[in-house]
Structure formats: C-alpha cells, structure tokens
Amino acid sequence: MGLSSSKDIDLLVNFIENRQGATLALPWPEDYRLTLHSVENIPEISREDVQNWAKTYMCCGGELVVVGVIHKAKTRTCRGPIVLQGARGHIYVYNGFFDRSLYHVASSFHDLFSNGLRFFYPIYETCDYALDSTVALDMIAHSKSFSELLHYRNERKNAFFTLKTYPYKTFVRFCNLSMTEFSSRHLIQWRRKLQTSLLDVVFIVQHNFFGDWRELVVVFDGHGMLFCVDREESLLFIARNMSDFLKIGCLRYNENRRLHTQWFTQDTDYIKQVDEMFSRDVLCPLREHCQRSRRERGLLKICTSLVRGVNCIERG
C-alpha cells in the first residue's frame, strides 16, 4: 500500500511510522521534497496543535493527520511547512512561519504528486519569475512607490509581456484607465471599496479561466497590492506586490485555496485583512460532502416547512 491509496487514518498513520524519514520528490517546485514524519518527530508541534488547526481552519471533516514536512532537496530537516491529510483524502499544508494559514493543495495524494504545490502560495517566494528575470527585476524596482510605477506604466503603454504561469499563459499589457472599458466613476468606486486615495490601472490581462478566456483589468494601490476587475466588475485580490504577481500571475483569481482563521464563520469580532476581504470566496474542500452546508440546507428546509405551515394556518 502506498500514500496514493491511504485514505484510512489508521493505515496512513502506520504507513508513516514504518517509513519515518523517507523522502519523496514533488513535481513542482522540482527542487522540493516531502519527507515523511509523524507528529511526534516534528519539533515545536503537538497532537493538541494539530487538533486546534482542525478546529480553527476546517469547515467540517474533523481530524487532520500529519504526513510530513516540505523542504528543499539539499536540506533534510524536520522543520518547514507541514503536510496533512484530512477527510476524504484531501491534502493540506500548514505554514506557521508565513501567515499561519492552512492551504488546501490537493484532493488526494495522487493529485499532489501530479501537480505539486501550485496552490500553496507561500512556496512561490522561493520560485523563479514567470518571465525573463531582468525584465521582472526592473519592473519590481519601479513598483516600490505608487508614483514611480505610474511613470513606468506611462512610458510603456501597449507594451506586452507573457507570464508562463500554471496552468495557462497569461498575456499582460501596460495600460491606463482610458484604454479600458471603465471610467473615472468606476475608479472612484474601487477607491471607496478599498478605502484608499491611491489606486490606478496598470495592466490589462488576457487570462485563461478554466478554458474560458477572460480579460481582466489590474489595478494597484499605494501599498503595492494588486487587484483585478473582471467583466462582472468584481474587485478581487490577486497579489501582495509586483514580485508576487510576476510569479503567481492570476492564480488567485481562479480559485481561493487559503483557509485563514475561521473563514467559515460569521464571527463579527474577527477583523479581516484587505486581501481576505477581497479574495474569492473560499469553498469547503469537501464540496458536495460538506457537513456544514448539509446542516444549513437541512435547517433551511425545516424553516421553509414551518413558514409554509404558518401560512396555511393563517389562510385557514
């Protein structure tokens, strides 16, 4: 039995204990490995920590099982992002060193060893740019200030470059607001939503969204964060800065796999960061098997039945 078939928790735990320290190559990034470790063999975390992660980050599905640690090929270590398996074989990565979030990276071990860590956004920090590095570094240098990036954009109107991002290419063109279908009224609305006075258009992007070519307008704010606006005029976060964009492209527009603290609750005391407020909604990894949505649908049916009953009594 291998990892690809390990959905039974007891079998998985036994498999990891028997192969403690075994290292497996990941398809992406190519210089990263997964070394199998049980929770007892990883410093600074405990079973209680893992149980708390399940309560904090999981919509439903209960237990998480530690599989191992991600690290670079030439560095064997027990410290690093932690790979876990959850309900129905779904795979997650927890990174306490970056943003203390849980990332849903794959629906199974087969998926993980086919596609790698594409949806574990912090890993892109260590990856190459998705275009020529000289061009990328020049662009990043000019994005350090809002006014400097505006000047850089104005000098390069209509200039194209291509981001070879997963899974499709992203075609990017420098532009200003007048070169888009939007007006100054839209720009004012976006500034209000983001609560900033510094916001402007920098790119038009042609991007393949699961087989459908989308044209997105990319805007940047005074903090260097990038957001996109699609044909439905949805304002969505796509990158923390220019370096982030030139590595990840529009992947965050496609799907949000970052499970931040209690994303599934309506806790009014939890203050969302700007990137969380304007990210695409997180979907429960279990989708149609989501226990929370089943309970909510059940409650909705009960409430609907009660309302119908009351209406019948009133008409009677």
Curated annotation (Swiss-Prot):
Name the record gives this protein: Protein U25
Highest classification ranks of the organism: Viruses, Duplodnaviria, Heunggongvirae, Peploviricota, Herviviricetes
InterPro entries recorded: US22-like
Pfam assignment, any one: US22
Family indicated by similarity: Belongs to the herpesviridae US22 family.
Name of encoding gene: U25
Highest taxon of the lineage: Viruses
UniProt organism field: Human herpesvirus 6A (strain Uganda-1102)
